[in-house]
From Swiss-Prot:
Disulfide bonds: none annotated. It is found in: Nucleus, Nucleolus. Belongs to the SLX9 family. This is Ribosome biogenesis protein SLX9. It comes from Saccharomyces cerevisiae (strain YJM789). The gene is SLX9. Interacts with the 35S, 23S and 20S pre-rRNAs and with the U3 snoRNA. Involved in ribosome biogenesis. Required for normal pre-rRNA processing in internal transcribed spacer 1 (ITS1). May be involved in the movements of the replication forks. GO terms for cellular component: 90S preribosome; nucleolus; preribosome, small subunit precursor. Keywords: Nucleus, Ribosome biogenesis, rRNA processing. Its main location: nucleus. Induction: Transiently up-regulated during the initial 15 minutes of dough-fermentation.
Length: 210
């Protein structure tokens, strides 16, 4: 009995493949061909995403950049303060504030100018030959503040003293009560009040304006 060949089909298939593809066919009928596959960004199962920390950092950077842009647009000083310590920035700002404050030398020069102006006004008033038709608006009047604060007191008026005892204190209330009783007794014994009480009261109220 003759044994059958089991590799006849394989040998036929390999021979057929070698005829079709030539010498590039490897053993076992597998082709060795190189293919250029383009890289697909969605080839991976899990796409790369920004983490929460990265998102927070990006937001902070954008916020700071916007603030810097606004500060440089609002005033050009902010652009010069980049890379400078906070203490030096404070010193520079303090120096700018000191420059804006008024100086004594400027005050002295203004006072000298005021004196010169007063002399010019006096000379001009003398040169006008005592003409009374000059408008008051064209003159500069120097008024003392003490004179403005003092009120004119009409003659014959009774001035009320402001340094009276305090009614909120027990001692002051007693003093005021004693003064009032003495005054009441004095008014009752007054002849003018006995003749015409309302007229006397009216006259006293008129006098008590200050």
């Amino acid at each position: 009995m003759v044994a059958k060949k089991r590799n006849t089909l394989r040998s036929k298939a390999s021979a057929r493949n070698s005829q079709n593809f030539g010498p590039d066919v490897a053993n076992n009928g597998i082709l060795d061909e190189s293919y250029d596959i383009e890289s697909d960004p969605r080839a991976f199962l899990h796409q790369p995403k920004e983490t929460k920390k990265e998102k927070l950092l990006n937001r902070q950077n954008t916020f700071l950049s916007n603030l810097k842009g606004k500060s440089t647009l609002s005033d050009g000083i902010g652009a010069n303060f980049d890379g400078i310590s906070k203490s030096s920035i404070r010193r520079r700002k303090r120096k700018l504030r000191e420059e804006l404050k008024p100086r004594m030398q400027d005050l002295l020069t203004s006072l000298e100018q005021e004196k010169d102006l007063r002399g010019i006004i006096e000379n001009s008033s003398k040169d006008m030959n005592n003409d009374d038709d000059i408008d008051m608006d064209s003159k500069i009047r120097f008024v003392d503040t003490k004179e403005m604060n003092l009120k004119k007191i009409e003659p014959g008026s009774v001035r009320i003293k402001k340094n009276q005892p305090n009614i909120r204190n027990q001692k002051g209330a007693k003093a005021l009560a004693a003064n009032e009783t003495a005054r009441f007794n004095q008014v009752l014994t007054n002849q003018d009040f006995q003749k015409n009480p309302f007229g006397a009261l009216r006259e006293v109220i008129k006098l008590q304006k200050h």
